[in-house]
Amino acid sequence: MNELDSLVTSARESFARSATPAELENAKAQFLGKSGRLTELMKGMAQLSPEEKKTRGAAINVAKQAVEAALAARRQELADAELQAQLKAEALDVTLPGRQRGRGGLHPVSLTLERIERIFGSMGFEVADGPEIETDWFNFTALNTPEDHPARSMHDTFYVEGGTPEAPNLLRTHTSPMQVRYAVQHVKKHRGLIDAGQAMPEIRVIAPGRTYRVDSDATHSPMFHQCEGLWIGENVSFKDLKVVFTDFCKTFFESDDLVLRFRPSFFPFTEPSAEIDIQFQSGPLAGKWLEVAGSGQVHPNVVRNMGLDPERFIGFAFGMGPDRLTMLRYGVNDLRLFFDGDIRFLSQFQ
């Protein structure tokens, strides 16, 4: 074996011993670097004759090509080995069971709202929807709220841009404006029957949704939910209110021994007005009177603002807080827990 064959064999063995790309580069420098063995052989050709240079140069080039081929082959082997190691590390066992996603669910207040809509829907009530940014007229004036009523102050109501000093816009403080909007459209639709003295289809509607007031403590939130109800016809009485709301409460709380109490109260939009309390006969709240709603016979001025004659049409309205009903149903004492977004708490109600 001559000198060049020995050099090629030595290079191949050195490359084969290189276990990493860095070691391979060091081995390459020993043979192909500026001071490598092949480079030194080429420098030594300077003392040779032209004929010897030709023969010697051709032999050195053949050896160099063999070394470079061995180097390229080893580089590919190391790259393949690195790829296989990476694939092995990232390999997926398709026989393993998949990771199950946690099951989501409705918010407890949403569950309550659906329950309310379902119960009143079974009684023939429709569901109304409307804007959360309301006009002063629909939120206060149409509901017989005096200009100097405390509820109109900035301490109780969130006013927003877009209105005028005479007709400001605000975040609705209750969902009663939706009742008025619904009633106005209902009256327009059946105006021909009304003017002809014929019977108009009764207005039976509930208006659930978000409302806003400047208030925040354990039992109040700046944003809270309300559900208002309205039933207007020619022969609707306070007795109907008592029957409807009693049936609702017994169905909602799934309790036949529930007792309701109507306490005289005052609201600008109803006359007479009453607070509605309930009393459980069993369970942790047994014997306690708990306020759940306000109610009353719709004030003649409100009936008139709906486009109806209060001498002919009469009805009742009620308003309750789904948030409070949710607290009572699930035994939660702090309203803010429902809106903190803690999945650990909310997941208990699924």
Swiss-Prot record:
It is found in: Cytoplasm. GO terms for molecular function: ATP binding; magnesium ion binding; phenylalanine-tRNA ligase activity; tRNA binding. Keywords: Aminoacyl-tRNA synthetase, ATP-binding, Cytoplasm, Ligase, Magnesium, Metal-binding, Nucleotide-binding, Protein biosynthesis. Disulfide bonds: none annotated. Mg(2+) binds at residue 271. Its cofactor is Mg(2+). It comes from the Bacteria. Its EC number is 6.1.1.20. It is an enzyme of class 6 (ligase). The keyword Aminoacyl-tRNA synthetase applies. One of its GO terms (biological process) is phenylalanyl-tRNA aminoacylation. CDD domains: PheRS_alpha_core (cd00496). GO terms for cellular component: cytoplasm. The keyword Hydrolase does not apply. PANTHER family: PHENYLALANINE--TRNA LIGASE, MITOCHONDRIAL, PHENYLALANYL-TRNA SYNTHETASE. Tetramer of two alpha and two beta subunits. Belongs to the class-II aminoacyl-tRNA synthetase family. Phe-tRNA synthetase alpha subunit type 1 subfamily. This is Phenylalanine--tRNA ligase alpha subunit. The gene is pheS.
